[in-house]
């Protein structure tokens, strides 16, 4: 019998193997990573943390725990950018973990200051 193969699909999400093989990350956090990855590539939409919380059936505590885990293990960065006297928040989902600080503040030129 010939080796089997998967039929190709349209509209699918590709996830880096790094997080799927990371034994330190819970299945809950991996699931949240997958959900975020599936949506952030959609054109003409800016996604917020609250949007993703509303897409899941987990309660606030479970969602926040998975969110924190992604930050703590370097898969999610939070950038604070100055915007007319306030801070604008931008999230960055990483393909590979970066164990440096997960929260970064930028000056008006976009340079990291903290």
PLM regions: where:
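N-terminal amphipathic alpha-helix
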Residues: 8-16
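Charged low-complexity intrinsically disordered patches
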Residues: 93-114
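Extended aliphatic helical segments
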Residues: 14-15, 35, 78, 112
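Winged helix-turn-helix DNA-binding recognition segment
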Residues: 19-29, 36-91
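N-terminal leader segment of winged-helix/HTH proteins
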Residues: 1-9, 77
């Amino acid at each position: 019998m010939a080796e089997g193969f998967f039929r190709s699909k349209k509209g699918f999400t590709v996830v880096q193997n790094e997080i799927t093989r990371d034994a330190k990350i819970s299945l809950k956090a991996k699931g949240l990573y997958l959900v975020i990855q599936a949506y952030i590539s959609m054109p003409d939409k800016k996604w917020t943390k609250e949007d993703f919380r509303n897409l899941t059936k987990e309660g606030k505590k479970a969602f926040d725990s998975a969110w924190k885990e992604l930050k703590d293990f370097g898969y999610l960065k939070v950038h604070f950018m100055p915007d007319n006297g306030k801070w604008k928040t931008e999230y960055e989902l990483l393909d590979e973990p970066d164990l440096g600080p997960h929260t970064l503040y930028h000056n008006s030129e976009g340079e990291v200051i903290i």
